[in-house]
Amino acid sequence: MSGFNDRYSHLLSKARQAMRFGRCAWAVQSTGEQVAVALVLNRADWLDELGYTLAEAIERAGQEWVAMIPQVARQLAESR
């Protein structure tokens, strides 16, 4: 379970950075992180910039990350 917690914390941290500092914080992340963070933040424009459709982004992020996205998004919304 700690592996899940580590990955959850990592995604939350990357999404929080992008939420606070915008595109410049997002642009330096790995492609996988960029895709997952764009999904968390509901940024279809960022996905488009990467050349991903929504369906392709979900596939790229993978089942484990996609499962975390709603919870990470809720936690970010609650912390605003």
Annotate each PLM feature.
Residues M1-V37, L41-R80:
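Charged, low-complexity intrinsically disordered segments and flexible loops
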